[in-house]
Amino acid sequence: MAIILGVDPGSRITGYGVIQCQGRQQIYLGSGCIRTSSDELPIRLKQIFEGLTEIIRQYQPEQFAIERVFMAKNADSALKLGQARGAAIVAATFADLPVAEYSATQIKSAVVGTGRAQKAQVQHMIQQLFKLPAAPQADAADALGVALCHYHTHQSLVAMGGRASSRTYGRYR
């Protein structure tokens, strides 16, 4: 049994999703968004760190997975996203959690079956997979997708006789 915290980082909105995995069963524990309130980036990064630290304290995950940075057209946006990822990763490492990272294409493939899925498709599949009464917010759905991707990748490695702690499955380097 493992509890996985998935994170979809953003400098304004950071989504999180927590699932518990038992064998082939994935159980929804919680999800939501950390919305930062300040225009000053250092304050927003602090809010992301503190928000995820509280989520980690509340759910006690054993594994942490985060979406990789994608190439943005705007360099300033890419830098801010990278800094938000850094705040999230520091929160995980402070809790001694192993950190894994996955591309958006890997995450969408794990959830929807195609790496080119739209956000609405990811939200719909997350709602169906976890039998939720309504689709979660886009950032929370993406974060749940990150957690599912991590679980499926972990299960595939174990099934192939690999080590679940292998650095080859998207571990942060």
From Swiss-Prot:
Coiled coil region boundaries: none
Keyword terms: Cytoplasm, DNA damage, DNA recombination, DNA repair, DNA-binding, Endonuclease, Hydrolase, Magnesium, Metal-binding, Nuclease
GO biological process, one term: DNA recombination
Signal peptide from the UniProt entry: none
Keyword DNA repair found: yes
Cofactor remark from the record: Binds 2 Mg(2+) ion per subunit.
CDD domains reported for this sequence: RuvC (cd16962)
The name this protein goes by in its record: Crossover junction endodeoxyribonuclease RuvC
Gene Ontology CC terms: cytoplasm; Holliday junction resolvase complex
Residues that hold Mg(2+) 2 according to the record: E67
Name of the gene this protein is made from: ruvC
